[in-house]
Regions:
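Pre-Walker A (pre-P-loop) alpha-helix and adjacent loop at the N terminus of AAA/AAA+ ATPase modules
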Residues: 1-23, 254-256
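Conserved AAA+ ATPase small/helical "lid" subdomain
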Residues: 142, 146-148, 153-220
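Walker B catalytic acidic pair
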Residues: 87-89
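A short helix-turn-beta junction within AAA+ P-loop NTPase domains corresponding to the substrate/partner-engaging
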Residues: 129-146
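C-terminal engagement/docking regions of AAA+ P-loop ATPases
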Residues: 208-256
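Short glycine-rich substrate-engagement loop in P-loop NTPases that contacts/grips substrate
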Residues: 53-80
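Loop/turn-to-beta-strand initiation segments
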Residues: 79-84, 110-118
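Walker A/P-loop
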Residues: 17-55, 138
Length: 256
């Protein structure tokens, strides 16, 4: 797809006519499977190849386009040279007007804007089958499968490394056990779940460090216990995560 875009640009630069093949894409999968990260990577590649002039990734929730369809043309105008990333794009199903405006703008800015529509596979397929015009413009559909438990543990390791946090040899076993007992439904969160776990542990470690400093003075803090996750940090984070999961599922089911 990128090679074809490059060939078309060379043809246009040399005054040759080109046959339009849409570069727009659909990223299909559950939350936390890397769709946004891949969109950002794609933007950088397209800029490096001189296929996009700006290379921003403009993230737009589809619900905002459904509620105010007239904003779609101005969205594309402001996104010239960039990628428009539409999250939960299946929400467009509720507004044929928004879909029509989207298709029209995708054609008008076909050489200047790349659209990526993201969402759950089943709902996205329903969206595309509801409008053949939209389907014909989203020629590339890429599946983002859920991460395995081992991959999620590796993501935990990477996130800790990036944030310069350490832990003892038992921590990864505890993390894997906690991940393994989760209900891996579409609301699980994948890498987002791991990020939330790490951030909760960071909050707990920070609070523990301050308590130690207040009770024993700053001299009690050394390089070994600073930015070091303990079992207590992890267990307290697990409690917070489980409570948040319960709240989220109640809201999803329509309870208050």
């Amino acid at each position: 797809r990128i090679d074809f875009m490059r060939a078309q640009k060379i043809q246009r630069d040399r005054g040759k006519s080109t046959s339009f093949v849409p570069a727009h894409m659909a990223f299909l999968g559950n939350p936390g499977t890397g769709k946004t990260e891949v969109a950002n990577l794609l933007a950088r590649i397209l800029v490096e190849k001189n296929l996009l002039s700006v290379g921003k990734v403009i993230q737009v929730p589809a619900v905002s386009l459904v509620s105010v369809p007239p904003v779609i043309p101005s969205l594309f105008e402001n996104a010239r040279g960039s990628i428009i990333f539409i999250d939960e794009a299946y929400t467009l199903l509720s507004s044929p007007t928004a879909i029509s405006s989207m298709v029209e703008s995708m054609d008008r800015y076909k050489n200047e804007v790349v659209v990526i529509m993201a969402g759950y596979s089943e709902e996205m397929n329903e969206l595309f089958h509801s409008n053949p015009g939209l389907m014909s413009r989203i020629r590339s559909q890429i599946d983002f499968p859920d991460y395995s438990d081992d991959e999620l543990v590796q993501i935990f390791e990477l996130m800790c490394l990036q944030r310069e946090y350490q832990y003892d040899s038992e921590m990864l076993k505890l993390v894997k056990q906690f991940i393994s007992i989760q209900d891996k439904d579409r609301y699980f969160g994948n890498a987002r779940f791991v990020r939330n776990l790490v951030e909760e542990m960071m909050l707990n470690e920070g609070a523990r460090t301050v308590r130690l400093c207040d009770s024993e003075g700053e001299d009690a803090i050394n390089d070994k216990n600073l930015k070091f996750f303990t079992k207590d940090d992890f267990e307290e984070a697990c409690v917070s995560i489980q409570q948040e999961i319960k709240r989220s599922k109640r809201l999803t089911l329509g309870f208050k």
